[in-house]
């Protein structure tokens, strides 16, 4: 894990990092480690998106519910002698920039949020002045053709 992060950090402009791991091998745990490493590098805002809402619920439990047996962090989380909190947010405008702020959504939900702006929701403007990390599980679904799009082409 440290080798991967060291290689990643040595790039001039790291743009993407992919972990190809089998089901049940600890991808979510690796993702939690990456979030903590990126926090130390100054990143505070994360968008976690997947193709299905039940994966979101499992991930929320792993990241936010300290009473869950699958919770991935210590009960008290400290980085550089500073206590921080992992919070679910709807946008980054009012988020505490000392905490780890995560928007959990589906791919479809992210598209909808960005293209149908609502008050206190995530917008394209959030990307203009903030460092935001995009995290995805089940990445093989991200570039896949939709059924609707495939039917149109056929």
Model segments located where?
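RecA-like P-loop NTPase motor core of helicase/translocase proteins
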Residues: 1-154
